[in-house]
Regions:
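N-terminal leader and targeting sequences that precede the mature domain
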Residues: 1-4
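Short, flexible helical or helix-coil boundary motifs
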Residues: 13-19, 47-50, 66, 70, ...
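Amphipathic alpha-helical interaction modules
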Residues: 49-80
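Amphipathic alpha-helical binding modules
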Residues: 82-130
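Short terminal alpha-helical segments
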Residues: 6-54, 110-114, 127
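Non-catalytic, well-ordered alpha-helical scaffold segments
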Residues: 41, 57-60, 104
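Charged, low-complexity surface segments at secondary-structure and domain boundaries
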Residues: 19-30, 60-64, 90-99
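Alpha-helix boundary/N-cap detector
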Residues: 27-38, 68-76, 97, 101, ...
Length: 130
């Protein structure tokens, strides 16, 4: 992970979304940066423990559960992928299916996403409305 990737992801967020919309799930509820960082760290721990099997057990499976958490985590990972690749859009649950992708790359994406969420995610609803 480099600081440049985190800075670029923040720049992309400001272009892609008005305000802090990326941090609200489909229900409209705010998801804090700390919560997303915890979700991504837990996903990485699960992949380390259970193993990564593209197409069978990957990002889609370890992020499954609460819809708000899934969608915001997906948006954070998309920002990081696009910051790395220069792409205009990316689907993280397809990114980990690319032939030649390694578990190390998947774990690095999750770590970078968690770092981005801790660094740039809102701490509370008051922070978003400010």
């Amino acid at each position: 992970m480099t600081a440049d990737v985190l800075v670029r992801a923040a720049e992309l967020e400001s272009v892609w979304y008005s305000g802090r919309r990326a941090w609200h799930g489909p229900s409209g509820e705010l998801v804090t940066g700390a919560r997303i960082a915890a979700v991504l760290a837990s996903a990485a721990a699960t992949l380390r423990r259970e193993g990564w099997a593209p197409g069978e057990f990957g990002l889609r499976e370890v992020l499954a559960g609460d819809r708000d958490l899934f969608m915001v985590a997906r948006q954070v990972l998309e920002l990081v992928i696009c910051a790395r690749t220069g792409a205009g859009a990316a689907e993280p649950v397809l990114w980990d299916l690319v032939p030649g992708r390694t578990v190390g790359q998947v774990l690095e994406l999750l770590a970078d996403g968690a770092a981005y969420a801790r660094r740039n995610g809102p701490a509370s609803a008051q922070e978003v409305s400010a």
